[in-house]
Amino acid sequence: MANLNKRPDWIKVKAPNSVEYYNTKDLIKNLRLNTVCEEAACPNIGECWSKKHATMMILGSVCTRACRFCNVKTGRPDLLDPHEPQRLAEAVQKLNLKHVVITSVDRDDLEDGGALHFAECINEIRKSSPNTTVEILTPDFLRKEGAAEIIAHSKPDVFNHNVETVPSLYKTIRPGARYYNSLSLLHSIKKLSSEIFTKSGMMVGLGEKISEVIQVMDDLREAKVDFLTIGQYLQPTKDHAEVAKYVTPEEFKYLERVARTKGFLMVSASPLTRSSYHADEDFQKLKQNYRQSLVS
């Protein structure tokens, strides 16, 4: 039996130590911003920050959910910071980002789930960096009427919402969420604004069956999702869900091949794939694939 306490060689990454990494870290700290890179203990932080790529996390650093896979703090959330959109826009400008990814904690305590704050962040970025494309990775806005309309009206270039895992694992892994609500949100954004690219991601290695993963692919295509990401689940602490399996690179290649047959414009599947990993390069590929789909 494999020792799941020891990560296989294909998971290991170099410790961050570049000058650019520390410059990015200092800028984020000085502007009092949060990043999911730090809060979720992302394994790709060294590579991304060395390239001045960081996924900004808005709406505070405390989540109202307690998902079993996530390392973000849970509890009573922070007060909404009305100046955060301006500081975020300043960071985007100083980092000279061509493509920015904005995510957030869940804010079940807010009437709109934080949708208007997302819109304000997008608007501020577009004021100061009009050529920067904007990708948002949102919570599910469960029971937040009108949230999808607010988001669609703000016109992000990419709308991302992760289904995270297969529906049979929701009760244990993502207990505060509803699988079909996530699908509905993704479909709603596409129906409200067809020019917005939609994206969703999931983790494997939590005990799911391959047949279940393939069913999720079908469900996402039914919801008109354009871009699918699949990555290895890594246990953040001993208090989180345990890794059931380390999926091999060959198995990821198989999942990617299957996903491509389903009609996604883009698929990224590998052990270290994360929602915003290489997001800037992938956005360019996404646009190119879309243009090719129009003439094929």
Swiss-Prot record:
UniProt-listed HAMAP family: Lipoyl_synth
GO CC annotation terms, alphabetical: cytoplasm
First-tier enzyme category under EC: transferase
Positions annotated to bind [4Fe-4S] cluster 1: C37, C42, C48, S276
Molecular function, one GO term: metal ion binding
PANTHER family (UniProt xref): LIPOYL SYNTHASE (PTHR10949), LIPOYL SYNTHASE, MITOCHONDRIAL (PTHR10949:SF0)
Recorded catalytic activity of this chain's protein: [[Fe-S] cluster scaffold protein carrying a second [4Fe-4S](2+) cluster] + N(6)-octanoyl-L-lysyl-[protein] + 2 oxidized [2Fe-2S]-[ferredoxin] + 2 S-adenosyl-L-methionine + 4 H(+) = [[Fe-S] cluster scaffold protein] + N(6)-[(R)-dihydrolipoyl]-L-lysyl-[protein] + 4 Fe(3+) + 2 hydrogen sulfide + 2 5'-deoxyadenosine + 2 L-methionine + 2 reduced [2Fe-2S]-[ferredoxin]
Cellular localization per UniProt: Cytoplasm
Lineage, top ranks: Bacteria, Pseudomonadati, Pseudomonadota, Alphaproteobacteria, Rickettsiales
Cofactor(s), by name: [4Fe-4S] cluster
Radical SAM core domain span: 49-265
Keyword 4Fe-4S attributed: yes
Keyword Metal-binding: yes
Residues given in the record as [4Fe-4S] cluster 2 binding sites: C63, C67, C70
Gene3D superfamilies referenced in this protein's UniProt entry, alphabetically: Aldolase class I
PROSITE patterns, sorted: RADICAL_SAM (PS51918)
Biochemical pathway: Protein modification; protein lipoylation via endogenous pathway; protein N(6)-(lipoyl)lysine from octanoyl-[acyl-carrier-protein]: step 2/2
Family per similarity comment: Belongs to the radical SAM superfamily. Lipoyl synthase family.
Protein name: Lipoyl synthase
Domain of life: Bacteria
SMART domains: Elp3
EC numbers, comma separated: 2.8.1.8
